[in-house]
Amino acid sequence: MIEKRYIIGCQSWGYDDWVTKADGPPVFYPRGTKQADMLEQYARLLETVEVDSTAYGTPPASTFEGWLEKVPPGFHFSLKVPRLITHEYSLDHRAYPLMTEFCDRARLLGEHLGIILIQLPAAFESTKPNGQRLREFLPILPNDLRFAIEFREPGWFVHWTFEELNEAGIALAMVEGPWVPRDVMFRAFGHLKTDHAYVRVMGERDLVKFDRVYRNRDDELAKWGECLPKLAAGEVFIYTDNHFEGHAPATANKLKRLLGLPVIDPGAIETQASLF
């Protein structure tokens, strides 16, 4: 059996609600943490992050350079592909040069680059024309980078899709969320053969505060904890969202416990910060 490495983080890092209040218990960031310092503090506790901002356009090189100055060796950024590629152009030929440009820019992250996520909208339905678009799009993806594709329409979870992605070495993103039923998602596990896997733990977007767990979803997480070891991949990237329970770092900790990994302790960096 392949020894697995679980690389667990959150979806984005810039949340003011994660800053510990002056008179409150540790939340995630030390008291007084500014937005400009959040990534550096984040990287002291977690080893990866999914970047949402890249979905709105390819960042300038200076943005990536700034990130690299704030993270230690071994930290990984996973990047969402610009929506112009996935939502506006729906992977057609107009998206090809934009994808090439994005990949070239992503390479600036070097060993800190994790997975590039191609997140397709629910409107990208499992039709024959869209299947042809997907088949023509996959070969333009460079072999030196790792990719995952997220479908938000259950019709894509069929053998044809699994075979196309496995042959291309591209992971099928596995998502806890309102788009694809969990049982459909879990049935796909046995068909995935790539050496990396990509998991997103998401929820309904009705919560507005993100400083603690507001709804306990331990039962759902336990099901993921049982199924994740069944993946064939040697590396499994997992990203939690605030909207799942109310506080993404707490959800990440729960998954770490389920998978037998050391949990993070926000109080530790709070104590260290108070010494200086």
Question: What is the role of each PLM region?
Answer:
Residues 1-276:
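Residues lining hydrophobic/aromatic ligand-binding pockets adjacent to catalytic sites
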